[in-house]
Amino acid sequence: MIQSKTLYACPGSGEELNFSDTGFSTSDGRRQFPTVDGVPNFLAYPSIEDGEQVQTLIWLNEEARTKGWEASLRAVYGKSSGIYQYVTDEQRAAFLDLLPLNDQAVVLEIGTGLGQITAPLAERCKLVYGLEVVPGQARFTGERCRQSGLTNVLVAAGGDDCQLPYASSGFDVVICNLVLEWCAAREQRIQAEAGQRQFLSEAFRVLKRGGNLWVNTKNRFSLRNLFDSSGGRTDDGKRTGRLRKVMLSLVGKNRHDGLTHSYNKLTAMLQEAGFRDLQSFWAAPEMRCPTAFIPTDPASVRAARQAGNLVQGDTRSTRLLMPLVPAPWVKLVMPGLTFLAKKYESGEI
């Protein structure tokens, strides 16, 4: 249930919004943000999902309301499907143990998907705001949380213009899990990297002083990108050869993976956005479903390897190659780039 007093604000201007039964609006009424099924819509652009995708999400939400959220996933996608496993695997939320969460924390999760992180996150926090660019997925996340008895979740559709529809300095933690590489994909006015930089600046803006940003994204120079002979696929589904994929990766134009960066480049982007005290983690064996988060300093990498039972890759080639990578270089070729970064005000440090 949306309350009249929230952290929602007009994207771009930051202007306070008035709330009514139909949604949110600016005080002069010139900008309107309608609410559908409890989900306000702050999207700047029309949806890019095709008709089949839209209809699938409509079916999913109808099934969720009548049969329950988990039964709807089974009915629409099948219990053995990759998407069912992906959005019900509790291990995907393991990174929450690394975050400074408590029963007073107000958290923003950007990119809720189908609520796979939102629900366990809400169990640990006072209040969770979720933002998702696909309205059908946002509605499913809200329904999933309601059916789980989580009344402390507010989900909105928005962020496609790399603007966050929230007031400044409102959140203790902002979570950006496997979103950064895609965050500017729908923004039509600026280049992708400029959109990503704007997105990081927005995350900095909405955090409280001393708040933390969690970023987990793909690594342009991961071993899998560079050496996995399976290659990948382009946006039209065609296979890419290993060499072509490597060359695309090197220049940051592997569209199948979104716009990705090196460890050093992303570090610089976070610092330029204002973040400090960057902590980096190696999500092993892979950043989507990790079983371990290892600090990337050489001593921690060596200790994790020596402890045994560490799976160092999710493909045959990466499992063979990663143990050979010197500890100081692991952060450069690990599957994903994972950071916990802190906001300080100018001149504070």
Spans of features found by a protein language model:
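N-terminal, positively charged/glycine-rich alpha-helical extensions of SAM-dependent methyltransferases
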Residues: S4-T6, E16-V76
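Class I SAM-dependent methyltransferase SAM/SAH-binding core
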Residues: Q116, P120-C162
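Conserved class I S-adenosyl-L-methionine
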Residues: W214-T240
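Short alpha-helix
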Residues: D257-G274, S280
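Conserved alpha-helix/loop element of class I SAM-dependent methyltransferases that forms part
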Residues: G82-A105
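A C-terminal cap/extension of S-adenosyl-L-methionine-dependent methyltransferases
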Residues: Q279-E348
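A short glycine-rich, Lys/Arg-flanked "PGG" loop and its adjoining helix->strand segment in the class I
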Residues: E193-N212
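A short acidic, Gly/Pro-enriched loop at the edge of an enzyme's catalytic core
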Residues: C162-V174
